Amino acid sequence: MTYAWLWTLLAFVLTWMVFHLIKMKKAATGDLEAEAEARRDGATDVIIVGAGVAGASLAYALAKDGRRVHVIERDLKEPQRFMGELMQAGGRFMLAQLGLEDCLEDIDAQEAKSLAIYKDGKHATLPFPDDKSFPHEPVGRLLRNGRLVQRLRQKAASLSNVQLEEGTVKSLIEEEGVVKGVTYKNSAGEEITAFAPLTVVCDGCYSNLRRSLVDNTEEVLSYMVGYVTKNSRLEDPHSLHLIFSKPLVCVIYQITSDEVRCVAEVPADSIPSISNGEMSTFLKKSMAPQIPETGNLREIFLKGIEEGLPEIKSTATKSMSSRLCDKRGVIVLGDAFNMRHPIIASGMMVALSDICILRNLLKPLPNLSNTKKVSDLVKSFYIIRKPMSATVNTLASIFSQVLVATTDEAREGMRQGCFNYLARGDFKTRGLMTILGGMNPHPLTLVLHLVAITLTSMGHLLSPFPSPRRFWHSLRILAWALQMLGAHLVDEGFKEMLIPTNAAAYRRNYIATTTV
């Protein structure tokens, strides 16, 4: 019997040793393959496709960690776009974490201290509140997006291990399901191949590489039409002015010390023509009368139209859920990865949050050539980002739907209830404003606010006296709210939306920290 126990123990030890040796051999083989890849890739650790806010910020962050970065951008001239003109307080904090907050200086950016809302002759101003658990000033920045992008590019290019090049990426280079680099045309028209162990695709909402990496489709929700009124200043230049106009919203805000951006949202299926003057007529006759005369909002809105509208622009508002890219050697970021309605102006904040997370995950790796290790880290990145991204995606989607004017009594009741909830100015409003500003990204807290807005809307519809018709419409409000919320619970994940530990971990690791 004693010998049997000894033989059993010996067999167990030998089996463990064999498995351990096999595991060590596999690890050694993986390291050797990684070293071989590193030798092949030569002077570049990361190729970044696109040098917008996301691409330029990521290039700087990775280069500061010692990575050799090659950035390929289609057009290095200053972008002339009117999206991405509000950096929320949470986004400013992320820039500070990356060492990039000085890029908001010297671009004539304006402080964004509050949201002003207007509906049917009533208005309220909702300041971004002080939050003791948010280690930064609760103030955003209103700005010219192109100026910010140029500052970020300059900051990235100032590092010796960043190569910023103008060129158009044509395709990704793949070998056995692993992305090894890109093929691109440089500014001289030469076709070049570039290799790196990691390629990051962040070439924006019109990405031509995304469809080869993820099975995802974008949805066009509406169009934003915008122009700049020059030599003007709002009486309240530190608020984002949101007008509950019909059929969709208008937004007015100060982007420089003497320029005001005016934006009107129009339905995707009925956008007036800009070239033949229909748009000017639409803005002047349909939208301008809905702009409140409070302050000088309507005056500035009309001034821009009457001065000839030299640079009226339109852009599609899009929505696209984030999807895991299962190919190794590549990551998708920014608007190429995840989009939401711009009503809460938080796209840049989500992208910068993603960059902070990704930088921290990659930082411990001595090199990026072990694609399995990088792939495993990227899978965890998709989970860690959820508190910020799910909160913003859900809030943007539901707000954009609720603020659509309609003759439907239930939906109009929800729209009025939303205004009433925001206009209260109590602790509930302050809590929602910390979420809007990115100071408290917490999906469960957002869900509770949405429930409260729904109940407020139902109460508004039932007062002063309930009737069978009003009761029926209040039930329709509840059903619609559950439908909207349920869609996001499915899309973002029940666990990620409803379990508070994920949000607590995100806040502990990425907000309650000191600037690096």
UniProtKB/Swiss-Prot annotation:
Q: What is its EC number?
A: 1.14.14.17
Q: Where is it mostly found?
A: membrane
Transmembrane as a keyword?
A: yes
Q: How does it sit in the membrane?
A: Multi-pass membrane protein
Q: Which cofactor does it need?
A: FAD
* Cellular compartment(s): Membrane
Q: Name one GO cellular component term.
A: endoplasmic reticulum
**InterPro entries given for it?**
FAD-dep_OxRdtase, FAD/NAD-bd_sf, Squalene_epoxidase, Squalene_monox
The residues listed in the UniProt record as binding FAD, with positions renumbered to this chain, are 53-54, 73-74, 81, 153, 169, 335, 348
Task: Please give one Gene Ontology molecular function term for this protein.
Answer: flavin adenine dinucleotide binding
Organism's domain of life? Eukaryota
Distribution of this protein across tissues and organs: Expressed mainly in seedlings and inflorescences.
| Tagged with keyword Cell wall biogenesis/degradation | no
Instruction: Return the similarity comment.
Output: Belongs to the squalene monooxygenase family.
Stated name of the protein: Squalene epoxidase 4
Organism classification = Eukaryota, Viridiplantae, Streptophyta, Embryophyta, Tracheophyta
